[in-house]
């Protein structure tokens, strides 16, 4: 793989996947680390370890299977830790991470997760993905309210470029956005410090009570709200890779990195959609290059973990929101088409889409899981009724 021979839109897709992933949830991980009692240096080490783990796993799986397999930390898992780690010591938090990732490895080895994913109808997987991505599309247009000049210009340039050179539309929008942000003086780089920080080994402290109260919920949230949508997104995009090896590999890697602050590494859904879209590459079989580029950017982000928070603060939120929405627009449209074009499965797909898009959280598990469950129940019930009426 030669970077100089990779088309610019493919390079941009890989970069955007990492940028949006960090921009959307790095602050949540920072909060969780603070709650656990980590120092600033230890938090920087956590970000370094997470970046390296995601970079290694993304590159290894993508290059091995030649499909765009993007990994990511679990954002719902990080949100759970913000409350779940309260009252725990840092050593106990590391023990929770190790137990969680050991459970993920066990789940992958038994093949239970793979068997469950095989029975999910394609329309429901697409509906769930559309529901996950909907908020990014809505945020993009909502950002016009506060930053009309910036976001309106990005939208107009994207639309004009889309008409004549579709593959370069997102690049053009990004460039005009940067120009306007620089002209307005909205980039603040005072807090960006590019000093590589090595991860610090933290001795784990295991507790049966914490394993039940924190590790088990974190395991369930990671599998239901991260790995399940990630595998379903791959399926919806038309890619197939053996599920169990993906889960085992990411779980083992996270297990190795757990003492350094890696609480999970799962299969990405939202950011992976950028690398799996036609904008990344017109040839479906070449889109793995975008994921490989993302893996390289993950490694770079890991090497400069101390700069991540400062970099996120330097960019206007509206610029990131508009860019994310434009990058995911075709994926949202394609997912909706795949979800709704089969009339017999349409009602179940609509239920899955709406429940997922609602942001519903029950027992600490996010709406993506419940969207699949609700859509699946509708699918089974409606098919049983149709079968009974037929005979």
List where the protein language model places each region.
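Short polybasic/polar patches that bind polyanions
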Residues: 34, 118, 235, 258, ...
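Residue-level signal for transmembrane alpha-helical positions in Major Facilitator Superfamily
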Residues: 23-24, 149, 225, 267, ...
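Helix-loop-helix hairpins and the membrane-proximal interhelical loops
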Residues: 1-44, 171-244, 391
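Helix-loop-helix junctions within the multi-pass membrane cores of secondary transporters/permeases
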Residues: 2-4, 10-29, 48-129, 241-329
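Short coil/loop linkers at secondary-structure junctions
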Residues: 38-39, 113, 167, 239-240, ...
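Membrane-embedded alpha-helical modules
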Residues: 86-192, 293-391
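Predominant activation on well-ordered alpha-helical scaffold segments within soluble catalytic domains
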Residues: 29-33, 57, 78-82, 138, ...
